[in-house]
Swiss-Prot record:
Expression is down-regulated in ovarian tumors (at protein level). Widely expressed with highest levels in placenta and heart. Expressed in the retina. Not detected in brain or thymus. InterPro entries: DRAM/TMEM150_Autophagy_Mod (IPR050911), Frag1/DRAM/Sfk1 (IPR019402). It comes from Homo sapiens. It is linked to Cone-rod dystrophy 21: A form of cone-rod dystrophy, an inherited retinal dystrophy characterized by retinal pigment deposits visible on fundus examination, predominantly in the macular region, and initial loss of cone photoreceptors followed by rod degeneration. This leads to decreased visual acuity and sensitivity in the central visual field, followed by loss of peripheral vision. Severe loss of vision occurs earlier than in retinitis pigmentosa, due to cone photoreceptors degenerating at a higher rate than rod photoreceptors. Induction: Not induced by p53/TP53 or TP73/p73. One of its GO terms (biological process) is photoreceptor cell maintenance. It comes from the Eukaryota. It is a multi-pass membrane protein. The keyword Transmembrane applies. This is DNA damage-regulated autophagy modulator protein 2. Plays a role in the initiation of autophagy. In the retina, might be involved in the process of photoreceptor cells renewal and recycling to preserve visual function. Induces apoptotic cell death when coexpressed with DRAM1. GO terms for cellular component: apical plasma membrane; cytoplasm; Golgi apparatus; intracellular membrane-bounded organelle; lysosomal membrane; lysosome; photoreceptor inner segment. Belongs to the DRAM/TMEM150 family.
Length: 266
């Protein structure tokens, strides 16, 4: 059996691979059509102009669904491992909410381009990166709370390093972006897709975009740490029928059907 066939480990793998493919394909398309500069564009710039924005939006919507599935499995796993720990239960619920909000933001970013609805796009980015960063932080605390009984210290330290990486990237991005859009480097910068080294604010722009890509990579790394954990879990779905037919008849007791939510043989 291959490693991705064990439990639900294919979920975080598929999430990272699919999201990376969304970025790569839209980037290649945008650069080939000269819609953006090859050197470190904003991630969302790779999906601003047609036809790449169609590809970007469709693929990131699927990525958001994969992300919700991954976050839900993680929630169920932690709940099953620590059903009576009040602190862990509260943190686990908070992580679920934060994760879902981050996925919602990802879908908003994918479907509202910055050149058309800038406010909606920025709101989606704040949800994606802001709530996503908090989700990583909460999951790292959970990893600390669950060691050494549930898992070893190595997982906690890896996730902590990824959270620090994410935090440094976020701070760099927010600082440089705030200065860049302060009004001292021109107006309507959100509409600008091409930057030249002689442009005012070029260095700040490059630092901001580099930090954004770096932050995304920290997200990828964090979800990849779920692979080993997800090898040890599977979910089932139960169908409860209230009658032998679908007509409006009185309910009668029958055997319920139980099958795996996701098969090991996928």
């Amino acid at each position: 059996m291959w490693w991705f066939q064990q439990g639900l480990s294919f979920l975080p793998s598929a999430l990272v691979i699919w999201t990376s493919a969304a970025f790569i394909f839209s980037y290649i398309t945008a650069v080939t059509l000269h819609h953006i500069d090859p050197a470190l564009p904003y991630i969302s710039d790779t999906g601003t102009v047609a036809p790449e924005k169609c590809l970007f939006g469709a693929m990131l919507n699927i990525a958001a669904v994969l992300c919700i599935a991954t976050i839900y499995v993680r929630y169920k796993q932690v709940h099953a491992l620590s059903p009576e720990e009040n602190v862990i239960i509260k943190l686990n619920k908070a992580g679920l909410v934060l994760g879902i909000l981050s996925c919602l933001g990802l879908s908003i970013v994918a479907n509202f381009q910055k050149t058309t609805l800038f406010a909606a796009h920025v709101s989606g980015a704040v949800l994606t990166f802001g709530m996503g960063s908090l989700y990583m932080f909460v999951q790292t605390i959970l990893s600390y709370q669950m060691q050494p009984k549930i898992h070893g210290k190595q997982v906690f330290w890896i996730r902590l390093l990824l959270v620090i990486w994410c935090g440094v990237s976020a701070l760099s991005m927010l600082t440089c972006s705030s200065v860049l859009h302060s009004g001292n480097f021109g107006t309507d910068l959100e509409q600008k897709l091409h930057w030249n080294p002689e442009d005012k604010g070029y260095v700040l722009h490059m630092i901001t975009t580099a930090a954004e890509w770096s932050m995304s990579f920290s997200f990828f790394g964090f979800f990849l740490t779920y692979i080993r954990d997800f090898q040890k879990i599977s979910l089932r779905v139960e169908a409860n029928l209230h009658g032998l037919t679908l007509y409006d008849t009185a309910p009668c007791p029958i055997n319920n059907e139980r099958t795996r939510l996701l098969s090991r043989d996928i």
